[in-house]
Every structure is written in structure tokens, then in C-alpha cells.
């Protein structure tokens, strides 16, 4: 899997503050800012504690700490993480997993936007960037979308390919695809 190299930008690491991008940092691309996303979108090669904390806050309510980690996926060298930063703060994240099925090579997992930053287009911007990457690879994307996120995915061109189903302890979902 190849990811484009972008212009110089910044990434946030909890223990070191904001660092300039260089070959030793985890970030491999920086995209231009979008309205409402002051610092823009950043591809990262590994998941950090801020990413796990946001996943836990948004996606794992009522579940034990540690459930926000995806064993085997977060450590897979093919997995990438697209994060949205505003003012140096992680406000949105997603995991792009290589998980092939007919017409789709990638799967979106762990898509989360901080409650304080919802309804600003951050989630759509993340999804559209994931779609751009998949399109460049000549493939589609699939996901298990929570019911409340289905309208956003539809606005981004995804279609429902399943009836509603429940993921125990997490809630109701639709299987969705974009090709």
C-alpha cells in the first residue's frame, strides 16, 4: 500500500508537543486545511494514546478500557490512521484496514469525531480523503456504520448493503460500501 508524501506540516505527540514533520516522525502526509479543520488531516503509521483515547470516548461508552484497541489490526504494517487536528488537538480519527472483499480492498474502522467538534464536516472530510486514497488504488471501501453515522456515509456516496444488525455492546449498524 502506498501513501502520498505531502508538504511540510505538523503532528502532535503527547509527550513532545507539536513536532515538524520529517523522516523520523510517524506522519507520512499532510493535507491542506479544510474549513473547520484548522490543522488539517494527517496520515499516521501507528496509533498513539490520543487516538486510543478518542476512540474510547466516542466509540466504547460502557465498555472496559482496552476495548478501543484493535488487536492485530492496530499493529498490522498495512493499517494506516487518518487523523484530523485542530489547534494541535486530535478531534477526529479513523483506521484504514486492509480487509478485502469483492470490489473493496479497504475497511474503515474506529471512525470517531470528538463530540465538541461534530457537525463541522470533519467526519465527511476524513471519509472523502479515505475515498481518494482508495480511488488512487483502484478499489472501494466498506464499513460497519453505526446507525447515527449512516446519513454522513450516504452523503459521501456509500450505500447500505445489509439490513440493520447489532454488534453486541456497541449498537445497531449497517454494512456499507463505496465503490
PLM feature segments, named:
Residues 117, 121-129:
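Conserved acetyl-CoA pyrophosphate-binding loop and the N-cap/start of the following alpha-helix
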Residues 142, 159-175:
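Conserved catalytic-core motifs of GNAT/GCN5-like acyltransferases
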Residues 55, 153, 158:
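Conserved active-site tyrosine of GNAT-family acetyltransferases
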Residues 22-89:
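Short amphipathic alpha-helix that is part of the acyltransferase structural core
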Residues 76-78, 102, 167-172:
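Short acidic/glycine-enriched loop/turn segments that link adjacent beta-strands
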Residues 83, 89-99, 105-112:
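Conserved beta-strand in the GNAT
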Residues 127, 134-146:
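Conserved GNAT acetyl-CoA-binding A-motif
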